[in-house]
Amino acid sequence: MSKFNLYSDYKPLGDQPKAIKSLVEHYKDGIKEQTLEGVTGSGKTFTMANVIEQLDKPTLVMSHNKTLAAQLYEEFKEFFPDNAVEYFVSYYDYYQPEAYVAQTDTFIDKESAINEEIDRLRHSATQSLLTRDDVIVVSSVSCIYGIGSPEDYAQFTLTLQTQQEISREDILKELVKMQYSRNDIEFIRGQFRVRGDVIEIFPINANYALRIELWGDEIDVIYKIDALKGDIIEELQKVIIFPAKHFVIAKEKQETAIANIKKELKERVDTFKATGKYVEAQRIEQRTNFDMEMLQEIGYCSGIENYSMHMNGRKWGETPYSLLRYFPDDYLTIIDESHVTVPQIRGMYEGDRARKENLIQYGFRLPSAKENRPLRFDEFMRAQNQVLYVSATPAAFELGRSKNKVEQIIRPTGLVDPEPIVRPIKNQVDDLLGEIRKCVDNNQRVLVTSLTKKMAEDLTDYYIKMNVKARYLHSEISTLERTEIIDELRRGDFDCLVGVNLLREGLDLPEVALVAILDADKEGFLRSQTSLIQTIGRAARNVNGRVILYADNITDSVRNAVNITKHRRKIQIAYNNDHNITPRSVVRKLKDKKIEEKVDDIQEIDNITTDEIDEIIKELEKEMKQAAKDLNFEKAAKLRDRIMELKEE
């Protein structure tokens, strides 16, 4: 019987049944890598869920950013309410890694703000992987970064049950070893408090606390309690408590690690002194000795991950521990939006290494800090068992490695791909003006992509002079303002949005009936086959969707993008005719305007006192933290940008 139970009001439709059947059969036949190529809106996530249920194995779902990962996490939680659906992304609301700028002799210390809720979810993910076999972890690229060894992490669990003979002192010692700290006043995750023979523990992965009541050296009763009010939720017979941090090691291993770190330190100091670098020698000696004292005293130090090679007992160049090591041997990895996520995985190692080289060269870190790193791409691929690449535009890498590719071209809504039209570049601006006016007459919106920021601004100015309600969008506009502009387009406050790279906005706007691609024959990143197909897809949410590509030369990218779109459109129209389906535009509610109204209320800064601004900032910070806790990162980003603007005032 399957461990995964998929709940949905829908059954697979269109291309979904065929795609699910093909993928599952090939995986069961031993195929390692496959690709699901599905157009926007074809229900790829539902197909992924069906594959997980039928393969019946733990699954890692990777996405290229936190917001998309949060959306997938929510969808999979709805599909699999009986199973462990977990979320593993970076727990930093804000993160400035330590760095050194040699030109100005400036050391930038690590600065971060940890999101406690995401930290809880990260621990929940690792604990589920070690205790259950019905786990789905939705993750960003964070899953390839170093965390502690799963063996050490599992070794430090504390199992408590009623009638167990154990003294109060022994329980407290174990909790301290597991990096829990005592705090009898403030009670938060990763802490415990003691009142006589009653110990209350707030597990790192929980929204509740545990109350252990002892009778002498025996556990009398265990309760799950409300952490804030202390009310009893239920009585428990047995509990398993996991460490408060992912980096935990036994005392003996720690002593060996410290000895090896000191040995490396001596070699590094000698090297610096031999080359006359006395400042660097003093710096590395002082910093490392301070960390070692902290380790010996409390078993932890700030930046402990930089000593992970020694802590884990790894050799130079050996693959570091990451979330992947917590999965069993037989698991599935689904890489969503693989055309973006795969290159992102590739790039993590080199970027991390370049920053560390500077820190090591100038005596801020030991050379072994380089071994606290994300996985190299070859290490990531070696760690895989079976992989599913998912994208509307899979890249050559995915297609080249996949033994089977399945297509999802039919949308459940019956929507077909927009009609692609190629026109000459001559008079493209005025030709497009006529098309925009037609759309405005039909209460439709228009997206226009230009090659440069200057062109986007000039084009917008020209169209405004021609009485078109137009706005532009590019990378210099803040996150807050970008989101507001997109919402205003949907509401009809203006009709035409001009941008450079509209792909980065994640624009799926049902109101957009025309997408115009200017200078479509200028080969490059934004006019590649993949980018053109992705841009064309921006008009695929409207039943009247069209795309105009302005090009004098039919490049391979233009030809392939147009041919692929026409091919899909032909299949979709034939399917609709055969099944008597009438296409209908996607209907999507506009977002809640409460935040926008709050921002509007405080636009007139000149009329507000400094104290009032401080109060507004406090209120917005509270809302920002709640939004991040709720995994609503778009809302959190808007609030963060507004807070920064207010602080500048």
From Swiss-Prot:
HAMAP family per record: UvrB
GO molecular function, one term: ATP hydrolysis activity
SUPFAM superfamilies: C-terminal UvrC-binding domain of UvrB, P-loop containing nucleoside triphosphate hydrolases
Gene field: uvrB
Protein name: UvrABC system protein B
Location relative to the cell: Cytoplasm
GO terms, biological process: nucleotide-excision repair; SOS response
Keyword tags: ATP-binding, Cytoplasm, DNA damage, DNA excision, DNA repair, Excision nuclease, Helicase, Hydrolase, Nucleotide-binding, SOS response
Domain of life: Archaea
Record note on domains: The beta-hairpin motif is involved in DNA binding.
GO cellular component, one term: cytoplasm
Family of the protein in this entry: Belongs to the UvrB family.
SMART domains per record: DEXDc (SM00487), HELICc (SM00490)
Main location: cytoplasm
Subunit: Forms a heterotetramer with UvrA during the search for lesions. Interacts with UvrC in an incision complex.
Residues annotated for ATP binding in this entry: G38, V39, T40, G41, S42, G43, K44, T45
